[in-house]
Amino acid sequence: MNEFQPVNRRQFLFTLGATAASAILLKGCGNPPSSSGGGTSSTTQPTAAGASDLEVKTIKLGYIPIFEAAPLIIGREKGFFAKYGLDVEVSKQASWAAARDNVILGSAGGGIDGGQWQMPMPALLTEGAISNGQKVPMYVLACLSTQGNGIAVSNQLKAQNLGLKLAPNRDFILNYPQTSGRKFKASYTFPNANQDFWIRYWFAAGGIDPDKDIELLTVPSAETLQNMRNGTIDCFSTGDPWPSRIAKDDVGYQAALTGQMWPYHPEEFLALRADWVDKHPKATLALLMGLMEAQQWCDQKANRAEMAKILSGRNFFNVPVSILQPILEGQIKVGADGKDLNNFDAGPLFWKSPRGSVSYPYKGLTLWFLVESIRWGFNKQVLPDIAAAQKLNDRVTREDLWQEAAKKLGVPAADIPTGSTRGTETFFDGITYNPDSPQAYLQSLKIKRA
């Protein structure tokens, strides 16, 4: 299965609509009105000053039905984007390859203007590395969420009780060809990006070379359940609700959460075509302000039940509330024994975490995805070394636009980062990443291609 193959846009692109409903006076984290009923209607916010001055009133954003998309969907359904004068169309994408192909087209060509992205897809699109050489300059504007991802393992391997630390299972996985007639098979949803990196890091930390000791496959999120059920894959890395759906359907179990691997790590990001942003600076700020309010709303515990109901709608995730709500409330089962973490902060967070801002696009964090690309020898033509990665990252990640939108929105100064890093990041295996010394991080890794 190759996600780099071109896709038929008409076959995969679905347009989601929403109509205005009851008006409420709400600032991001207030008490919610009645649910929109699973994505069939929209709540109108009071219109903000300046909303009529935008260069454009519409934008089309793509998303994949996993929790990282929640702020985009909630921003649309709860009227936060409309409050700032924008009619945001959120368009479900069949795969990351479909999203890539559609942003190349742009909305004027029947595609999308941007949306939710695994990293470093925006940087790679900017350089034409994943678009057959066609450069599509992109800007990264905000981080959509932290955590909310996991690594699920087939129930056929329940006796092995694979967990966060794989060292005890190393011999079992290395000897898999002798015991099972093939290499251990693991999957992710798109190559050379977030979920590929998470599963590679997990294996490598356990002394298992993901390029030599196992077989890695690309499988879209929605197909992971069936592929694990029929034995095509032994484990996979993707965003919830799919790992939890595997456990709920008793097909597999969650061996590890990415939030355990790297607490409060950056997950997926909002990125737009640079030409759209450059042409519509006011609309870009309006989009960011609406997103920020949506992220604040998403982070309120009192709103998680309604959030689950909205996301469960057929137009969006098409997954039962009974699966979505526990994850959003931090009731996540991990391990072969299905132990419940019961920790709200272990689930997806959208606005703030114990490490500070979730939404802010720290350049030091977006850089990690490019450094990890260098680690595995990906896209050497555009990422030959750390200096090239830093230069590309500085061009693509727009901290300045986030800061401007936050100030305009009235976000407290204490919640607006002024630096480009959170300091040193520590992984579960003791490895540290200092964004100011990325080469030292690379040198500290035992299994790598760099």
Swiss-Prot record:
Q: Its membrane topology, per UniProt?
A: Peripheral membrane protein
Sorted alphabetically, the Gene Ontology cellular component annotations on this record are:
plasma membrane
Q: Where are the transmembrane segments?
A: none
Pfam families, per database record: NMT1_2 (PF13379)
Q: List the disulfide bonds.
A: none
Question: What family is this protein classified in?
Answer: Belongs to the CmpA/NrtA family.
- Name-wise, this protein is Bicarbonate-binding protein CmpA
